[in-house]
């Protein structure tokens, strides 16, 4: 018997029977305030700290005769070490006791004492409104107030007490979390979020219901957070006022918000975070789970009528292969999708609200151009609505006609019964591989919870020619192989968006045949200067409308004239021969360049190509490798010719440390550091290049180790690369380095807030360095150069950009270091450390001056290159002879010897 009694005792040493007798003996608190402050029921806890327990019971005459006493007990948890905090809260609840409380049970580690509340006019007005509202309610509730010093103690106490209840009817209501303990510091938002999530999860696992909404949990902190502030996910955050009147009014408002929005709202059920089904969300998750080879990307910008769909994706998509990232706007969704499709073939799902299809801007056309596979869900109005808010189906416009004009496939679903058929058609269009598919869906469709088992058909992908199938030896293929095996000494391959497997074959073929490789402004790094940590002996440089390298220019020209078509041939691999890919005019392409084009799309076959290879790239490369038969002497002459053209700067400015720095100087110094890191530490990075002079300079002058992403692709939209950086930071397997001009920076939103949001969700993906160079020269430099070098005009206001210097900032978020710093000089130590330190975002604002020198931007620079070629003709011939005499070896044998370089 003695053991049984001990087992049923609670933590204060009272068994249930004793507790019940004591509770009945307590004087009703409503009528005797002075007794409330002095009468205590309870005993000391087993620990050294004191414990207090009190039960207050309203007398019958104090309750409304028409009020229905609720058998539910609502828990109010107060986590604090501050007696004044707790006692002020008790006093406020006591002040609105009429019409609301039937029974109050208090468990506290602090003395129970009511304070004299401040007679403030605002508080009195709030109290009057609260009582007026409470008079209209037809129930009185039971409340259990639990005060603890920590969340862990509160968790244990609630679970323990709940386990002892014979008929548990306890639902957790409000949680007041005090972070203002003297001599303490506020926890970070993410730490409080994690602690609260663990608290509510523990209650849920123990079967304890809770009103778990934004009105149920409040944390009080000392001061506003700085420099980064964001919305907590599990609670509301308030700075505790030092003014007692303000503090008591805030507590009253918080309680009434909870009571009105949760307890009296029967749509809110005390069962924790309610996970509603969403038909469209589940079907899209299942589709990408079936079709995506590995990860698939989800990104959204929320709106009211798509918030349920987004909430479902947030809860369920990641566990089924999705990576959910956010950007600062809808435009960023398209940029992130394009970059990740081009570099990693990652399909995507984008979700936007009504009227936002236009916010994708020209990047939507780029997604179509690059054939990025993905689905965009956009909210739309019903066709019979009259000028609906944000709708684009009105008597004067129709978004569907816009999509038709842009040749972007879409489906419009405005009936829940048609979801199955609409998704079947959307999936069929997706498998055609012609770019993103748009689903325009009305609110009833977006919020549907109906089951669609068996109602959606996923057609099989359209069969394509497999790279494993042997290519028939067509006449054009035979001619291409003959050019490789027996063709001219100058054989150049410009690489488009080749995959890793394709480049591995290209590298082997170039090594065996002596082929020179170049990349382009649209696909920088497709032919890297360093491959697998070693200098790539086949790499010449960049060939493009802007930014063509001196080595490439010298290789293709003699005395400022293109070499004869019989002496050289240019292969353009996976290319449309777009204007951006070469500096050559239409006339030169037609009459002066022997061009071989490889593309799988017959719509891309160019009229300038002398030889068309309409076939799969990987299959072509495998066929070429199988038929390689290059004469060793020809191969050595080709190799010697490549090695003879050196990778030296073409202008003096690149060596001159002026102030402000020139772009030439900054990138020359940066390249020196990066090449040293590659060669000594195996440094590897993904480059991101925005539209502008400095993006050109970086693509041309900074060594690359792998394919990067370029904003110059397609429409060449300023800002695309910057917005894509926020996504590539989480998907790139290497460090990330972005080169963004001040023009591009100013044309799109700041990426830092969205970047921090993703840090809070995916910190495990950031074991790398992300560096963004904001290159600030105060003008739109490419236009400036056009005006000054081509039209011989002075610069004008239209090219001017205003840069406002910001103070340097360093901050840590979720164990990730962020630094923002202005660089006026090239600080090698700072840059080296930034590039090689993981878990770090570096935002460098680099102060530069404008000039028209170098980087292959203007014809004037081309003429200076020609003069340099003529002046150093003898040195070049000596270099060719030296290279031809070197013994044959592996691909690392052609590393540059700085002591033997000559200007070319």
UniProtKB/Swiss-Prot annotation:
- Locate the compositionally biased regions of type Polar residues: 886-904
Similarity-based family: Belongs to the TPP enzyme family.
Enzyme Commission designation: 2.2.1.12
Name of the featured protein:
Thiamine diphosphate dependent-3-acetyloctanal synthase PigD
Identify the enzyme class: transferase
Region listing for Disordered, in residue ranges: 879-904
The prosthetic group or cofactor this protein requires is: thiamine diphosphate
List the catalysed reactions: (2E)-octenal + pyruvate + H(+) = (S)-3-acetyloctanal + CO2
- Tell me the InterPro entries matching this sequence: THDP-binding (IPR029061)
One GO biological process term: antibiotic biosynthetic process
> Which pathway, metabolic or otherwise, does it act in?
Antibiotic biosynthesis; prodigiosin biosynthesis
Keyword annotations: Antibiotic biosynthesis, Thiamine pyrophosphate, Transferase
């Amino acid at each position: 018997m003695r053991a049984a009694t001990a087992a049923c005792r609670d933590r204060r040493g009272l068994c249930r029977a004793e507790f019940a007798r004591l509770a009945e003996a307590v004087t009703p608190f409503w009528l005797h305030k002075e007794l409330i402050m002095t009468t205590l029921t309870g005993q000391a806890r087993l620990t050294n700290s004191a414990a207090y327990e009190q039960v207050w019971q309203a007398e019958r005459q104090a309750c409304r005769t028409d009020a229905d006493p609720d058998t539910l007990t609502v828990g109010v948890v107060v986590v604090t070490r501050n007696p004044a905090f707790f006692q002020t809260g008790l006093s406020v609840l006591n002040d609105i006791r009429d019409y609301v409380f039937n029974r109050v049970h208090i468990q506290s580690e602090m003395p129970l004492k009511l304070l004299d509340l401040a007679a403030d006019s605002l508080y009195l007005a709030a109290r009057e409104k609260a009582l007026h509202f409470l008079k209209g309610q037809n129930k009185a509730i039971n409340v259990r107030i639990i005060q603890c010093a920590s969340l862990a103690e509160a968790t244990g106490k609630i679970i323990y007490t709940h386990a002892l209840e014979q008929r548990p009817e306890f639902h957790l209501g409000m949680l007041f979390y005090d972070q203002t303990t003297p001599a303490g510091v506020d926890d970070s938002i993410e730490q409080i979020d994690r602690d609260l999530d663990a608290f509510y999860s523990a209650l849920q696992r123990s079967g304890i219901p809770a009103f778990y909404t934004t009105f149920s949990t409040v944390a009080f902190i000392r001061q506003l957070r700085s420099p980064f502030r964001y919305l907590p996910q599990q609670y509301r955050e308030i700075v505790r006022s030092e003014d007692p009147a303000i503090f008591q009014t805030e507590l009253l408002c918080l309680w009434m918000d909870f009571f009105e929005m949760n307890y009296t709202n029967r749509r809110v059920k005390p069962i924790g975070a309610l996970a509603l089904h969403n038909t469209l969300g589940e079907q899209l998750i299942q589709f990408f789970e079936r079709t995506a080879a590995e990860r698939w990307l989800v990104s959204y910008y929320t709106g009211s009528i798509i918030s349920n769909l987004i909430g479902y994706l947030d809860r369920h998509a990641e566990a089924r292969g999705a990576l959910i990232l956010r950007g600062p706007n809808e435009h960023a969704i398209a940029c992130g999708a394009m970059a990740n499709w081009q570099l990693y073939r990652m399909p995507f799902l984008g979700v936007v609200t009504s009227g936002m299809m236009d916010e994708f801007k020209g990047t939507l056309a780029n997604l179509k151009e690059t054939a990025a596979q993905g689905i965009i869900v956009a909210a739309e109005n019903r066709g019979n609505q009259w000028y609906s808010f944000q709708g684009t189906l009105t008597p004067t416009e129709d978004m569907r006609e816009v999509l038709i004009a842009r040749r972007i496939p879409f489906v419009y679903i405005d009936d829940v019964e048609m979801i199955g058929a609409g998704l079947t058609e959307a999936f069929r269009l997706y498998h055609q591989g012609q770019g993103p598919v748009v689903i325009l869906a009305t609110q009833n469709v977006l919020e549907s919870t109906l089951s669609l088992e068996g109602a959606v058909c996923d057609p099989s992908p359209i069969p394509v020619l497999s790279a494993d199938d042997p290519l028939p030896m067509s006449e054009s293929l035979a001619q291409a192989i003959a050019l490789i095996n027996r063709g001219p000494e100058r054989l150049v391959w410009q690489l488009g968006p080749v995959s890793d497997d394709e480049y591995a074959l290209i590298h082997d073929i170039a090594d065996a045949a002596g082929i020179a490789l170049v990349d382009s402004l649209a696909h920088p790094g497709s032919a890297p200067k360093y491959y697998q940590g070693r200098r790539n002996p086949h790499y010449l440089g960049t060939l493009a409308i802007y930014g063509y390298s001196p080595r490439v220019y010298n290789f293709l020209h003699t005395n400022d004239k293109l070499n004869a078509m019989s002496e050289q041939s240019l292969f353009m691999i996976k290319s449309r021969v777009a204007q951006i890919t070469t500096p050559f005019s239409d006339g030169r392409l037609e009459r002066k360049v022997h061009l071989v084009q490889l593309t799988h799309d017959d719509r891309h076959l160019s009229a300038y190509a002398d030889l068309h290879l309409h076939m799969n790239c990987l299959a072509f490369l495998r066929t070429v490798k199988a038929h390689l038969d290059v004469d060793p002497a020809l191969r050595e002459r080709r190799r010697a010719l490549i090695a003879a053209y050196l990778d030296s700067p073409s202008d003096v400015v690149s060596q001159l440390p002026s102030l402000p720095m020139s772009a030439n100087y900054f990138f020359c110094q940066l390249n020196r550091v990066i090449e040293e890191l590659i060669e000594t530490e195996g440094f590897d990075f993904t480059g991101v290049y925005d539209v502008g002079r400095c993006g050109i300079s970086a693509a041309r002058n900074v060594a690359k180790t792998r394919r990067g992403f370029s904003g110059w692709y397609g429409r060449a939209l300023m800002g695309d690369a910057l917005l894509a950086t926020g996504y590539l930071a989480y998907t790139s397997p290497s460090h990330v380095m972005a080169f963004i001009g001040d023009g591009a920076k100013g044309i799109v939103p700041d990426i830092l807030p969205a970047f921090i949001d993703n840090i809070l969700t995916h910190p495990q993906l950031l074991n790398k360095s992300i560096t963004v160079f904001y290159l600030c020269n105060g003008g739109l430099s490419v236009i400036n150069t056009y005006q000054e070098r081509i039209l011989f005009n002075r610069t004008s206001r239209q090219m001017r950009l205003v840069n406002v210097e910001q103070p340097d900032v360093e901050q840590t978020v979720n164990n990730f270091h962020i630094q923002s710093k202005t660089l006026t000089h090239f600080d090698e130590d700072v840059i080296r450390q930034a590039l090689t330190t993981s878990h770090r975002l570096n935002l460098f604002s680099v102060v530069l001056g404008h000039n028209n020198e170098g980087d292959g931007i203007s014809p004037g620079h081309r003429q200076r290159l020609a003069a340099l070629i003529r002046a150093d003709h003898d040195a070049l011939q000596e270099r060719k002879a030296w290279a031809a005499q070197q013994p044959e070896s592996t691909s690392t044998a052609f590393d540059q010897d700085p002591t033997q370089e000559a200007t070319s």
